[in-house]
From Swiss-Prot:
<protein>
    <recommendedName>
        <fullName>Actin cytoskeleton-regulatory complex protein END3</fullName>
    </recommendedName>
</protein>
<feature type="binding site">
    <location>
        <position position="64"/>
    </location>
    <ligand>
        <name>Ca(2+)</name>
    </ligand>
</feature>
<dbReference type="GO" id="GO:1990964">
    <property type="term" value="C:actin cytoskeleton-regulatory complex"/>
</dbReference>
<dbReference type="InterPro" id="IPR002048">
    <property type="entry name" value="EF_hand_dom"/>
</dbReference>
<dbReference type="GO" id="GO:0010008">
    <property type="term" value="C:endosome membrane"/>
</dbReference>
<dbReference type="GO" id="GO:0016197">
    <property type="term" value="P:endosomal transport"/>
</dbReference>
<keyword id="KW-0106">Calcium</keyword>
<dbReference type="GO" id="GO:0007015">
    <property type="term" value="P:actin filament organization"/>
</dbReference>
<dbReference type="Pfam" id="PF12761">
    <property type="entry name" value="End3"/>
</dbReference>
<dbReference type="GO" id="GO:0030476">
    <property type="term" value="P:ascospore wall assembly"/>
</dbReference>
<comment type="function">
    <text>Component of the PAN1 actin cytoskeleton-regulatory complex required for the internalization of endosomes during actin-coupled endocytosis. The complex links the site of endocytosis to the cell membrane-associated actin cytoskeleton. Mediates uptake of external molecules and vacuolar degradation of plasma membrane proteins. Plays a role in the proper organization of the cell membrane-associated actin cytoskeleton and promotes its destabilization.</text>
</comment>
<keyword id="KW-0967">Endosome</keyword>
<feature type="binding site">
    <location>
        <position position="59"/>
    </location>
    <ligand>
        <name>Ca(2+)</name>
    </ligand>
</feature>
<dbReference type="GO" id="GO:0006897">
    <property type="term" value="P:endocytosis"/>
</dbReference>
<comment type="subunit">
    <text>Component of the PAN1 actin cytoskeleton-regulatory complex.</text>
</comment>
<feature type="domain" description="EF-hand">
    <location>
        <begin position="40"/>
        <end position="75"/>
    </location>
</feature>
<keyword id="KW-0206">Cytoskeleton</keyword>
Length: 368
């Protein structure tokens, strides 16, 4: 991790001055737009804030602000893989060295007084009370046409309930309960998905690397889908059929799971198969539309930051007596970049809505 350069400190001073510090300090609300714009997990941002706030007053003076900004930029630019547990010596300002040393000593004393407790393991038993609670959560999750649950629709709801869990924990747990990597999973593995995440959030349990054998066998069973492009199975026919009426008949010798060929368009059964295929495709598009809610949330954050920058720019024009003037060109560039990103998100959402409408029209034409 490269050390601080003079040009960095000047850049951080411009940002710090633009936040209108009071008594040379900024609070969390003032820094919040910068934190949001970094797109880092809240757990990472909380740890960075804790390290930077050396005097523990819930505010950052300029020296502490420099620490906060440098750690954020290093994480965003992937100069470091994770936030350090302790500040490196070169990032500790001389005026704060004593406070950092005292805080480290307090932490050591506190850790010495606390008996070491092993991280609890996941309890695989789901009590009737827990199951009822999980089913209440499931009732608020959008399901596919076959009643299964996708990753995007499930995590969208759970992120508002489990605040101590990062994206990596969601992904690791999903892979655990979905060993076959299906696009969506049934109710039982989804219940265990919630069960594991709840214990991770509330008790700090480690996410296991494997399932108990009984659960693994259950969750690995093939699911029936209506995807005509699936390679799950093949349809074979037998022509050796006897008939008392001397009429030629064909019987299906084996149809395993869901590989069904597209038949004669005039055949009612074939049309039903095509309808099932379109239903499956519609479900996929709806899942993507669900994911747009995350996009809309990001868009709202960008718009909030845009509004903040506009207010900041207007204040800078009016405050000609301010000792430190904001860089108007920099702010203008920021506004332009944010507007472009919002535009891209809007166009992406519009395209997905058009795709959904086209698919619904196809289904309606098949139903006629």
């Amino acid at each position: 991790m490269p050390k601080l350069e003079q040009f960095e400190i000047k850049k951080y001073w411009q940002i710090f001055s633009g936040l209108k510090p009071v008594e040379n300090k900024v609070n969390h609300d003032q820094v919040l737009p910068i934190l949001y714009n970094s797109k880092l997990d809240s757990s990472i941002l909380n740890k960075i804030w804790f390290l930077a706030d050396i005097d523990d007053d819930d505010n950052l003076d300029f020296e502490e602000f420099v620490i906060c900004m440098r750690l954020i930029f290093d994480m965003v630019n992937k100069n470091i893989d994770k936030v350090p547990d302790e500040l490196p010596d070169w990032l500790i300002p001389g005026s704060k060295a004593k406070l950092v040393k005292e805080r480290k000593q307090r932490k050591q004393i506190e850790n010495a007084d606390i008996p070491k407790v092993e991280t609890p393991k996941i309890d695989w038993y789901i009590s009737p009370e827990d199951k009822k609670s999980y089913e209440n959560i499931l009732s608020g999750i959008q399901t596919a046409t076959d009643g299964s649950y996708s990753y995007s629709s499930t995590t969208l709801v759970l992120k508002s309930k489990f605040f101590n869990i990062g994206t990596s924990d969601f992904e690791k747990t999903w892979k655990l309960v979905n060993p076959k990597n299906f696009a969506s999973i049934d109710k039982d593995p989804t219940l265990y998905f919630i069960h594991i995440l709840r214990q991770r959030n509330d008790l700090g349990c480690n996410i296991p690397s494997e399932l108990p054998k009984a659960l693994l066998d259950s969750f690995s069973k093939e699911r029936v889908t209506y995807d005509l492009n699936s390679n799950q199975s093949q349809v074979t026919r037998s022509s050796n059929v006897r008939s008392n009426t001397n009429m030629s008949q064909h019987t299906i010798e084996a149809i395993r799971m869901n590989e069904i060929p597209r038949g004669n368009p005039n055949d009612a059964a074939s049309l039903e198969i095509e309808l099932n295929s379109l239903d499956a495709e519609l479900n996929r598009i709806r899942d993507e539309i669900t994911r747009q809610e995350d996009t809309i949330l990001i868009r709202e954050q960008f718009e909030g930051l845009l509004s903040y920058k506009e207010q900041q720019y207007q204040k800078s024009k009016q405050s000609s007596m301010s000792p430190v003037k904001l860089n108007a060109k920099s702010i203008s560039d920021d506004l332009s970049n944010i507007e472009q990103q919002v535009g891209v998100l809007e166009n992406y959402l519009a395209d997905k809505k058009v795709e959904l409408q086209q698919l619904e029209s196809q289904i309606q034409s098949v139903n006629k």
